[in-house]
Amino acid sequence: MEEQPLCTLSVKDLMEAGAHFGHQTRRWNPKMKLYIFEEKNGLYIINLAKTLYQLRNALPHVCKVIKENKPILFVGTKKQAKCVIKEAAIEAGEYFVAERWLGGMLTNMATIRNSIKTLDKIEKDLTQNSSCLTKKEIALLAKRHQKLLKNLEGIRYLRKIPGLVIVVDPSYEKIAVAEAKKLGIPVLALVDTNCDPTPIDYVVPCNDDSLKSIRLIISAIKDNIINTKKKLGVEIVSPIKTLSTEDGSEEIDIAAGDDNRKEDLLAKKYDSNEAN
């Protein structure tokens, strides 16, 4: 008998994270009625027993995707989700979109690959051809580099269609969901009471506006990915990398984040070029 994925979460854990709080009753989607426990003080309360049941039912598919050697794509671009999504994907060695979903990220990968090639060329210029550039040129390249990296860093090394897309708030990420469905990619989503669960293959009803709720559920999914990979002896490789400078004296973390600081680091690194 195949070993079942581990889910140590309890209804109490979910309640303490505020996962049961849905949206105001006037903002609900009737298709979520199945997952609603009651209405209280103008809010819908999510049935956490069903949340736990749905999550436990979804985890075997997550593990199956890993066993089939298919990539998983985490998507969460709204404020409450982006940090959680990015951290979980990096820890699990999977891919992510945490800033902005660019149309065609799944359905028009050729165009996205061209943007990634541009990013690669800029990095090559910054690391290998810096002696031919002025400080101003380096600063401009660094700025463009960060703009591209911010949107593409999580899928830069994604070489094939994902076997699963994990979404926080499908109403917010409707383009990502639509592209996944067009390609026949299963979608697992954290779904609040205002969402339409119809296009979602694995619905996990919960408060998708609470950082604690998102972190708790995404962490449970991430932990199962990591555990499955360890059991299979699969190496966990971060989807982002470090940019090495030409002389190899210093490495600059190129994960998007503090754009101004990274631009300064890149420019300062090559200050001497103007003098040469």
Curated annotation (Swiss-Prot):
Entry-linked Pfam families: Ribosomal_S2 (PF00318)
SUPFAM superfamilies reported for this sequence: Ribosomal protein S2
Top-level taxon: Bacteria
Signal peptide stretch: none
Keyword set, alphabetical order: Ribonucleoprotein, Ribosomal protein
InterPro entries, alphabetized: Ribosomal_uS2 (IPR001865), Ribosomal_uS2_bac/mit/plastid (IPR005706), Ribosomal_uS2_CS (IPR018130), Ribosomal_uS2_flav_dom_sf (IPR023591)
Entry GO terms, CC: cytosolic small ribosomal subunit
GO molecular function: structural constituent of ribosome
Record GO biological process: translation
Annotated family: Belongs to the universal ribosomal protein uS2 family.
Matching NCBIfam families: rpsB_bact
Protein name in the entry: Small ribosomal subunit protein uS2
Native source species: Chlamydia caviae (strain ATCC VR-813 / DSM 19441 / 03DC25 / GPIC)
Gene that encodes it: rpsB
